[in-house]
A protein has these predicted regions:
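ATP/NTP-dependent adenylation/nucleotidyl-transfer catalytic domains that generate, transfer
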Residues: 1-161
Length: 161
């Protein structure tokens, strides 16, 4: 944590700057007055992506279960505790419909791109648990179709009743 006092002020300024930088696939800077392209605007909030990926890989949960947990974790930013130094403007909340929509996009992209993992050369497994490497624990056919996961996701209502 930057506010823990582990680093000097100059280092803290650099770390805050890095954390505050928008992540973008664009290598060309935006023109003056334009916003840089936001990866999160295209693929969804990283906090939801990470939450979904963790529960899918680590626990093998169905999408409907992940959405249920996501909704309980992210429905109200004012509830629960946040890490020390976590800025108020970075405390997000998402309604059920948004969570379901971002999960749908995640499933389509994640499952539809498994073929990219099978092109890696053979090599050693370095880390246990949660690896997406073809030599790791994750095993999914490179020609997998997301239909079963998307069908499960459709069992989730768009709004909470």
């Amino acid at each position: 944590c930057i506010s823990s006092g582990q680093f000097n002020e100059a280092t803290n300024v650099v770390l805050e700057s890095v954390l505050g930088t928008e992540i973008s696939p664009e290598l060309v800077p935006a023109r003056p007055g334009e916003k840089i392209q936001s990866t999160q605007a295209k693929i969804g909030p990283y906090e939801l992506q990470d939450f979904t990926l963790y529960h899918l890989l680590r626990h093998g949960m169905r999408p409907s279960r992940i959405v249920f947990l996501s909704h309980h974790a992210w429905r109200d930013a004012s509830v629960g505790s946040w890490p020390p130094g976590f800025h108020d403007e970075d405390r997000h909340s998402y309604d059920l419909s948004a969570i379901k929509g971002w999960t749908r996009l995640f499933l389509r992209r994640f499952i539809g791109n498994q073929f990219k993992r099978s092109t890696l050369p053979n090599g050693p497994k370095v880390v246990a648990g949660g690896s997406l490497s073809p030599r790791g624990d994750w095993r999914m056919p490179s020609d997998a179709v997301a239909r079963a996961w998307l069908d499960d996701l459709e069992t989730v209502p768009d709004e909470r009743s």
